[in-house]
């Protein structure tokens, strides 16, 4: 190999090395963006999990508070069998016409429970 060929080979190697270095820098920049996005998503995911946990706890608390008492369950059963359980116009115990819903009965069963 003469000096000219050696010099040309060295220049070609230098070009390839510069190209490889530019690729490495580009990949490094992309990798930095991916790592940053991943960190953001992990934080967001953690916040969403905490929010979901709070919602589940509230729903669990609401379900415990919405359980009907034994007497209201009995009224609900009578209502489902087609009888009034409200005392509007002395209708308690009378048959509901065509089993139509009665908001007064529903209020007695499911209404405010303080």
From Swiss-Prot:
Superkingdom: Bacteria
Cofactor note: Binds 1 zinc ion per subunit.
Cofactor(s) required, per the database record: Zn(2+)
List of residues binding Zn(2+): 84, 86, 102, 105
Keyword field: Cytoplasm, DNA replication, DNA replication inhibitor, Metal-binding, Zinc
Intracellular or extracellular location(s): Cytoplasm, Nucleoid
Similarity annotation: Belongs to the YabA family.
Protein name as annotated: Replication initiation control protein YabA
Species this protein is from: Ligilactobacillus salivarius (strain UCC118) (Lactobacillus salivarius)
């Amino acid at each position: 190999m003469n000096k000219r060929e050696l010099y040309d080979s060295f220049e070609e190697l230098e070009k390839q090395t510069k190209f490889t270095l530019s690729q490495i820098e580009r990949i490094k920049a992309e990798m930095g963006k991916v790592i940053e996005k991943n960190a953001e998503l992990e934080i967001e995911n953690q916040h969403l999990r905490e929010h979901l946990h709070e919602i589940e706890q509230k729903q669990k608390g609401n379900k415990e508070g919405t359980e009907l008492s034994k007497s209201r369950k009995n009224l609900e059963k009578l209502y489902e069998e087609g009888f009034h359980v409200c005392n509007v116009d002395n209708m308690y115990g009378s048959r509901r016409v065509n089993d139509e819903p009665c908001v007064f009965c529903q209020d007695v069963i499911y209404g405010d429970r303080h």
